[in-house]
Amino acid sequence: MNEARAIARCEEAAALLPPRFRRAALQMPDHRKRYTEEFRLRAGQPPAALLPEGEVTLPYFGADSRVTPRDLAQMVDAVTDYSRYACAETLRQGFLCLHGGFRLGVCGTAMLRNGAVASLRDISSLSLRIVTERIGLAEPTADSLFCACLLYTSPSPRDRSLS
């Protein structure tokens, strides 16, 4: 992925963050935006970005600027268009597929019904993964596979709902 596209994808992901964290993510220097893999919001912790060299705190807040449970709930409500029920199936599995190919990992308290996760409450952290295109990444592996190899995976829950 070229540099301009990587920066644009980071900015698209930042637009999904709660407003006070969105500004910080958008203020990151381009050399950091280019390599940002995900944004992490954990209750009681400062917001962070995951880069190849590790996790870095978004530096544009004071030391007392920490993610609150309200920030987390606000973000989940916003990305589900205020209809968590419509996304309940994937939310029970701990993630949400978002417009633009982004994926939001969700951690909270699982509510069980008959031994299975029925819902999540008390969300404690979110991880917004930035999808990137890596052209040619699998070529070395693909060359060593059998000539007639079929890779199969079941469709995601989102794909099943479209059929």
Question: Where are the regions a protein language model picked out?
Answer:
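N-terminal accessory targeting/assembly segments
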Residues: 1-100
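Conserved small/polar residues in nucleotide/adenosyl-binding loops
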Residues: 152-159
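Flexible, glycine-rich phosphate/dinucleotide-binding loops
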Residues: 48, 112-113, 160
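A short, sequence-level motif marking secondary-structure junctions
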Residues: 61-67, 109-111, 153
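P-loop NTP-binding catalytic core
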Residues: 84-149
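Conserved ATP-binding/catalytic motifs of P-loop helicase motor domains
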Residues: 163
